[in-house]
Amino acid sequence: PRARVELSVKPSEAVSSTIFGGIVGGFLLGIPFLNLLLVWGVLGGFLTVHLLKMRVDKFGNGYIKNSDALLFGGLSGVVSAFIATLFNVVYAVLLKDWFVQAGEFLVSSGMDSALADVTIKLCVTDLSLSLPFILLKLIAMIILFAVLGAVGGALSSEFSKR
C-alpha cells in the first residue's frame, strides 16, 4: 500500500469545487418533501471535498486535511442554503395551489392542521411569502447546512485516507 500524503489546499483552488458541491446540495435540498432527507447536505459537502481532492492530488495518494475538509464542506453547505431558499420561494410562487392541496390532504389523512402547516413550511416555505419567515428559515438553513456540509467533507477526507 502507498503512503497517504496530507494535501494542502489554497482557497483559490477550492472555489469551483465548493460552488459545484453547494449547487448540487442546494438543488437536492430545494426539492419539496425530498428536502426533509437532510442527507443531501452531507452529500454536497462530500462531493465538494472529493472534487477538491481530484483537483489537487497529482499522484492519487493524498487526502484533504481535516480542517480544509470541514471548512470547504461547510462553505458548500452555505451555498446550498441560498440555492435551496431560492428554489423554495420559486416553488411557493409557482406551485402554491398544489401545496395548499397537499396540506389539505395531510389534514384529511388525520394529521393535526398545525403540524400539516409546519410540514409545508419545512418542505417549501411560508406560502404567504412572509419575508421575516423566509429570512429566519434562511439563517437556520445556513447553520444547519453548513454543519451537514462539514460532516460530508470530513467523511470524504476520512474515506480518502483508506
Model-derived segments and spans:
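Juxtamembrane/disordered regions of integral membrane proteins
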Residues: 1-162
